């Protein structure tokens, strides 16, 4: 849980940043935003893969299989495909302006998947439990587990010390 949940949070936040910055880049043509989104994408893909793999490991004893076509798992796989599409568009399309336009459109469409991932456990009957941590209202997770979880999420995103 201490690896899986923060990795999933970061993967969602990373793609949200990519999508929003890509939309701004599509409208305002700010080249620095392209560099930022291209830098975030591989990291977000890595965290998405970590979330999927650790979720499979976590789910095996509970569900009896490493993979189930659950709504949240499937939508996370779709998120990984959006990350891959975003990355490969920049790698394969030689015209930078065209690559930016296409990848911005892909990212904007991928943004639709973020609330699907978040609310899939509430909208459909899934194998995943409902959210244990709530911004509004009381969380169902004990503070002795919440603090390490938030600390690991913070450590995932903190810069490494310089040598």
Residue map of PLM features:
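Membrane-interface transmembrane-helix boundary segments in multi-pass integral membrane proteins
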Residues: 125-155
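Conserved small/polar residues in nucleotide/adenosyl-binding loops
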Residues: 156-163
């Amino acid at each position: 849980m201490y690896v899986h949940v923060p990795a999933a949070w970061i993967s969602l936040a990373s793609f949200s940043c990519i999508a929003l910055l890509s939309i701004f880049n599509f409208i305002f043509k700010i080249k620095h935003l392209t560099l930022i989104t291209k830098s975030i994408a591989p990291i977000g893909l890595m965290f998405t893969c970590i979330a999927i793999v650790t979720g499979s490991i976590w789910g095996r004893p509970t569900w009896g299989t490493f993979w189930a076509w659950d709504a949240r798992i499937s939508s996370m796989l779709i998120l990984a495909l959006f990350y891959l599409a975003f990355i490969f568009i920049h790698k394969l399309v030689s015209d930078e302006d065209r690559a930016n336009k296409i990848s911005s459109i892909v990212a904007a469409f991928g943004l639709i998947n973020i609330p699907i991932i978040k609310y899939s456990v509430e909208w459909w009957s899934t194998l995943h439990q409902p959210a244990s941590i709530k911004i509004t209202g009381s969380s169902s997770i004990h503070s002795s587990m919440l603090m390490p979880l938030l600390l690991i999420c913070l450590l995932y995103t903190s810069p490494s010390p310089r040598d």
